Amino acid sequence: LDVFVDSLIQLADGPAAALKRPVLAYITVPAGNVGPRKDLQARLKDPNAQMDPSVIRNITHYLSAPEWDPIIGKIKNTKLMDPTSPVQVMFVPSYLNGVDGIFDKDYYELLCGMDVTVFPSYYEPWGYTPLESVAFSVPTITTSLAGFGLWVAEHCKEHKGVEVIDRNDANDSEVVTEIASSIE
């Protein structure tokens, strides 16, 4: 996740004119949540409902310990927290099983609405998430350290819809730049 968030920070820090359109990135990783944000639920029902300024605006569910959450820690104090930034992040720390209280749709229903997915795995023996994206006609970015990425690189001369970024122990900054460039 670090290289994905770093790529979003790189996009947000770059010239806004470089982006072809605004970017809304969802980080959908279950974490220690204690239920959906009440203010967000109210806003989804009524666009005039007030948002709670004491809650981090980039999150869909309350966290049991937001001060210890690595994703919040990573985006805090960056342009990703700026509501005027052309790059926005929404952290969804809940299983998307159709009853999360915010989306109330399962993962696959939400996946179909994505323009692209990013799974910059450092290591996954196979890594089904990029495969699921392609199965739902959503282009994906993965790495040469994920089994699926390796398989695509080895078996598909033209792998349209799947970008495989070369990743190793020493090239995180290059991976960040390549992901940012691909999203751009």
Where are each of the predicted segments found?
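Conserved catalytic-core segment of nucleotide-activated headgroup transferases in glycan assembly
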Residues: 1-108, 167
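Catalytic binding pocket for nucleotide-activated donors in carbohydrate/polymer assembly enzymes
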Residues: 120-184
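Acidic donor-binding loop of glycosyltransferase active sites
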Residues: 108-125
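A structural signal for short secondary-structure junctions
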Residues: 19-20, 111-112, 134, 157
